Amino acid sequence: MKIVMLDGETLPLSLPTGQIQADWEIRPQTSANDVVPALTGATVAITNKVALRAETLEKLPELRFICVAATGYDCIDLDACRARDILVSNVPGYSTQSVSESVIAAIFALRRQLMAYALNTRIDWPQAAHFCLHRQTIQDIAGATLGIVGKGDIGQAVGRLAQALGMQVQYAERKGSDRIREGYVSFEQMLATSDIISLHCPLSEQTRQLIDRQTLSQMKPHAQLINTARGGLINEDDLAAALKQGVIGGAALDVLSSEPPTADNPLLADLPTLLLTPHIAWASRSGVENLVSGVMTNIAAFVQGQPVNLVN
């Protein structure tokens, strides 16, 4: 059996390939043009973000199993996999703790103006007239309202941590829904009443560019936006404009629509109220270890004829 990982460099820990008897190939990265040659003859493909679409899958008759080394699997054409009887598994829950803690860290950074004051300290404090600097307004976390979009494992974990800090937590119903489920508020109410909004929903045709000029204009003027889910949830041109114009108070993003971003991405501009990190909210040591373990568990289960964590 041939097993190929297409983007091994995305994992800071190596897969313990000796646990499963197979012909392993761990490729650092694989361009779109090289996917078919790389997977020719392979029974199992492992991918973190390398896309596997219908036009690629039809050229790989021996491929039987795809393990996505992540929780989100929007890089896989599930319909094409079903048509070709290719099983697909993901690794759910591996980063729940890491991502939820990253969100709380972002809330502190934004509300307490840590980025701005770190800069002020070096430039202005030595010339200050007294013991402290008063520049940007600092806001408390306790008592603030956190709106969460997506009530999966990570969304609920963020909610629990936020409540422990004294925050008021509300979960948004799906945009455009005519029915509000128990435990939710309407999407529009969440926008209008939240001090911080954190995105934790999958990327789909229904959620693509969920946050755009219109939704940004419905948020509180001081509200702050956090996205650790998928970059495509946000219209990046609209967000950059909103931050420049002060439509909202700030944002913290760990994901962008294209990764790595192109140099002309508007969110790479000088935006003092934006905290941008390179898709590492998931990557605590324990998060990475959980992911590696989950990948190996999925492959072992497939080899034994009892696949787990199937998404198709």
Show the residue positions of the predicted features.
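An anion/phosphate-binding loop that grips the pyrophosphate of nucleotide cofactors and donors
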Residues: 42, 60-63, 193-194
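Phosphate-binding beta-alpha-beta segment of Rossmann-like dinucleotide-binding domains, i.e.
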Residues: 92-145
